[in-house]
């Protein structure tokens, strides 16, 4: 194993740290292709060693969800004009309570929404700047956080979940039309970034529930949300780009729709979703990104075995690490690589 190189962490911590560099028998990109297609991968990719990970705003120059604020709450305005408050304790942002919404009425979206500028020259410069940074590694996979999907953006512009869910019920046609136009915007945005930063995977965010149940019914999913989401996913995948779909909430009732949308990976809340039962039911048609939620060495190393055994038998599996302790993160990363190499070696040699 090489001494290690300093990489930039994007997520709940932005502290640079050293991670192992492994002498792999095939390229990171080839192994990822195999993982995405259940085609005999050799190890489990992880966010620290296999990916160049960026926030969308780094690549577009547009104000976007971010994790670079300090220890105090900070207000900020996103690319659509929504007002957010950075919450350091949560490691993320929430719509600012009492903030003025972009829209009071979703039926006004055609006249009142100001669509963000997709200036190609600005995006080109942002992508080139990102690729010039010392933490960017050409041999790694290009992976970025695309940002909010259909229902999250609807909620954001209307000022909250109550307003967003009421709009879905009271003005379904306007909501659907807005989400279709948002999808057209998203396709243009994706294509421009992909032109200047060939993209291996995006993370798409659309939270569909609380820890108790989904925000909306199967009928709303089928009539309003599914089609624009499917159009975007199909376009991204047609360009050879994988999708990691992050969706918070107890989304058991929506799993069939997620499988039909066919992202390579789902990133879901472990405490309210039984990933093992989903895997048992859908097999190779469903995949997962499982995040390490601890800096306890023994727990991280045990999880490196457990989740692979249960969820990654044939592929469609990777791990995200938001580490703040360099030594523990290093050891956990080594354990994941070494164990997964042994796991797949045994599987393919038997």
Regions found by a protein language model. Give the residues of each.
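Active-site loop segments of alpha/beta catalytic cores
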Residues: 1-51, 77, 111-350
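Short, basic/low-complexity N-terminal boundary segments at the transition from targeting/disordered tails
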Residues: 44-64
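Short acidic, Pro/Gly- and aromatic-enriched capping/linker segments at domain boundaries
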Residues: 58-76
């Amino acid at each position: 194993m090489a001494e290690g190189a300093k990489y930039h962490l994007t997520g709940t911590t932005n502290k640079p740290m050293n991670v192992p560099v492994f002498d792999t028998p095939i390229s990171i990109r080839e192994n990822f292709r195999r993982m995405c297609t259940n085609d005999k991968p050799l190890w489990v990719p992880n966010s620290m060693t296999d990916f160049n990970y960026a926030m969308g705003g780094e690549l577009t120059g547009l104000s976007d969800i971010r994790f670079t604020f300090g220890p105090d709450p900070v207000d900020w305005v996103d690319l659509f004009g929504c007002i957010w408050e950075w919450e350091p304790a949560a490691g993320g942002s929430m719509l600012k309570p009492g903030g003025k919404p972009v829209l009071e009425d979703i039926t006004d979206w055609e006249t009142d929404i100001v669509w963000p500028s997709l200036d190609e020259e600005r995006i080109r410069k942002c992508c080139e700047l990102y690729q010039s940074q010392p933490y960017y590694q050409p041999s790694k996979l290009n992976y970025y956080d695309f940002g909010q999907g259909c229902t999250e953006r609807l909620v954001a512009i209307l000022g909250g979940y109550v307003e967003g869910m009421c709009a879905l019920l009271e003005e379904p046609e306007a909501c659907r039309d807005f989400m279709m136009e948002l999808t057209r915007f998203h396709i243009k945005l994706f294509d421009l970034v992909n032109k200047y930063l060939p993209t291996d995977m995006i993370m798409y965010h659309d939270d569909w529930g609380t820890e108790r149940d989904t925000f909306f019914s199967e009928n709303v999913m089928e009539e309003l949300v599914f089609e624009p989401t499917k159009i975007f996913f199909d376009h991204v995948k047609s360009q050879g780009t994988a999708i990691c779909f992050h969706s918070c909430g107890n989304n058991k009732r929506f799993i069939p729709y997620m499988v039909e949308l066919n992202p390579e990976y789902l990133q879901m809340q472990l405490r309210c979703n039984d990933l093992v039962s989903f895997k048992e039911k859908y097999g190779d048609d469903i995949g997962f990104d499982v995040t390490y939620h601890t800096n306890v060495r023994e727990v991280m190393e045990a999880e490196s075995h457990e989740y692979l055994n249960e969820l990654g038998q044939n592929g469609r599996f990777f791990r995200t690490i938001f580490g703040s302790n360099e030594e523990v993160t290093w050891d956990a990363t080594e354990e994941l690589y070494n164990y997964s190499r042994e796991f797949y070696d045994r599987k393919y040699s038997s």
